[in-house]
C-alpha cells in the first residue's frame, strides 16, 4: 500500500480552505451591489454556495487518491446523541459568551454578536433560507464532507480537531469562536460514527433554526419573551445533554463498542512542515482581529 504524504494532504486541505475563506470575505462587498433585500440575499446565498462547494469539488480532484470514506452505520439512540450534541454546543456558547463579555465591557473588542432583525414574515423566510438551510447544507458538505473526510488518513482525533478548528476560524468572529469549534467536534464525531453527512446537516440546521426562532420572537413579540424561551430551551438542552452523557457512559461500561469510532488512519509520514496550515491560521486570525477588535 502506498504511504500517505500527510504534509501534502494537510497543505492541500488547508489551501482549499484558504481559498474558501478568501472568497467568503468578498460577501460584504457584494452586498453593496443592490439595495433590494431579496435580490441581495439571493446573490449572497448563491456566492456563498459557490465559495464553498466549487473549491471543495476542485479539492476532490486534487487529492482524490487519498480518499477515505467512513463506513455508513445506523445511529442508535438518536435522541441520546441529539441532546449530547445540542447540550455541548449550548454549553460552549455560554462559555464563549462569558469569555467575550469582560473584553467587550473593557472596550477591548467591539460587539461580536450577530443580531439580525426581522420586520415581516418575508424577512423570516429569507433568514431561514440564509441561516437555517443554505449554511448547514453547504458548510457540512465542505467541512465534514470534504475537510474532515480528507483528513481521516492522519487519524480520527487529529482529523476532528483540525477540521473543527478550520470550521471555527472560518467564521472569523470571537462571538462564535469557542462554540463553533465545539460544534465542529460534535458534527465531526457524528459524521465519522454514522458515515453520513445527513445527521450533521440536520443538527446544524436545528442549531441555526433555533437562532432564527429566537430572532423572530424578539422582533415580533418582545425581547423578554425571546429571553424566556431561550433560557427555557437552553436549560432543556443542558440538562438533557448532561443526562444523556451520563446514560452514554453507563452504556459504554456495559458495551465498549457503543459510540466507538472505527479508525481510518493510514500509514504515512510528515515529510515537511505544513506551511499552508499556518498561512490559513494567520489569515483567519487577522480577519478576527480586524473584525472584532476596536
Language-model-detected regions and their locations in the chain:
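Alpha-helical transmembrane spans of integral membrane proteins, capturing the lipid-embedded, hydrophobic core
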Residues: 14-25, 45-53, 81-94, 128, ...
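Alpha-helical transmembrane segments in multi-pass membrane proteins
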Residues: 21-61, 229-240
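Interfacial transmembrane-helix boundary/kink motif in multi-pass membrane proteins
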Residues: 2-19, 46, 63-95, 259-284
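Transmembrane helix-loop junctions in multipass membrane proteins, especially transporters and channels
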Residues: 29, 33-36, 60-68, 97, ...
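Transmembrane helix-loop-helix hairpins at the membrane interface
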Residues: 124-293
